[in-house]
Amino acid sequence: MTTEYYARTCGKKLLGLVVPVFKTNVRASSVLLGIFALPFALAAPAKALQVEVNPATPQLGDTISVVVSLDNPANGSNVTVTNGDQTYPAYEIAPLQYRALIPTTPLEKAGTRTLRVAGEGQVQNLSVQVRQRKFPVQRINLPPGKAGVEATEYELKRAAEFKALQTPEKFWDGPFLAPNKGRVSTIYGVRRYYNGKFADDYYHRGIDYAGAAGSPVVAPAAGRVVLVGKVSQGFRIHGNVVGIDHGQGVASIFMHLSRINVKEGDFVKPGQLIGAVGSTGAATGPHLHWGFYVNGKSVDPVPWRNQVVK
C-alpha cells in the first residue's frame, strides 16, 4: 500500500432588397446595390461553436473531454474551457479541432458543472452532470518507522513541478497499457484510516499493482521521462520513482520501484521497460503505485485503459 497523495442552427434567410436601377447609369446602380447590401452581409449570423463533451454523464474520478471544432484556423490559440474558477488550455488534436481535459476527483461534490467554452469570439455555457461514486474505505496500520515519514522539501518541489507540467504535443495514441502484470490490490479513489485516524483530505491517487518484487514495470503509453527520483536523493514517500509526461497535461508517475531503467529526457514507447517493482519509500510491501494526473489532479486511469479519450 502507499500513503501517497469534459446545433448548429443553419438558418437561411432570403433577404429581399429592392434597389432602383436606372438604365441611364448602370455604374451608379451597381454602387447603390453595394452600399445597401453591405450592412446585410456584415449582419450575417455567426456559426455556433461545435462542442462535444465525453463522457456525457461522467462520474467523480473521470476525465471530462471537451472537443471544440472551429471554422477559422486563426482562432485556434484562443480556445479555452473554464470550470468554476479554473481555466484549462485547449490543445490541437486535429486540423481545426481543439480539446481541453477537465479532471474530477473524489474530494469534489457530484452535481451540475457549468463549462464555459470560448472560441472564435463566441462563448457557450454547457451543463454537465457529474455523478456520485462510492469509494471504498481501507484501514491501514503502518509499521513503526513508516507512520511518521514525511516528504522532504526537495521531494515535494519535484513532485509539484511534475504535476504542473504542460506540453502542447500529444505523445500518447490509443488506450493505455497496464504498467505491470500483477493483480490490482488497491483501486483509485479509496479513502483511508491510517493507524485509526481518518484522513479526510486523502484519497488513493492511483492504482496499486501487487506485482512480485523485481517484476517489470513498463510505460503505459508514449511520453518523455521528466522525473527520476531516488531514496538517496530524499524521496522518502515516493521511494524510487519515475514520472512520464504524455503531453497536453497528461502524466503518469510510478512509485516504490526497486530499480530504474530510464533517465530524465528519455523518450519511451508503450510497453518499454522503465523499472521494477519494489517497496522503497512509504510502502508496506512490494507493489507498484501508478498515479495518473490530468492538469495537475489525480484521476482514475481505468477509463484511459478501456477506451481512447476523445
Q: What is each model feature region?
A:
Residues 30-41:
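Bacterial N-terminal signal peptides
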Residues 272-284, 290-310:
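Extended, charge-rich intrinsically disordered regulatory tails
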Residues 47-119, 123-126:
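Cationic-aromatic interfacial patches
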Residues 127-238:
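Surface-exposed, glycine-biased beta-strand/turn segments
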Residues 220-261, 286, 291-292:
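Zn2+-dependent peptidoglycan hydrolase active-site motif and core
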Residues 216-227, 259-277:
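Short, well-structured beta-strand-loop connectors
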Residues 6-32:
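Bacterial N-terminal signal peptides that target proteins for export
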Residues 69, 120, 228-230, 273, ...:
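Short, surface-exposed secondary-structure boundary micro-motifs
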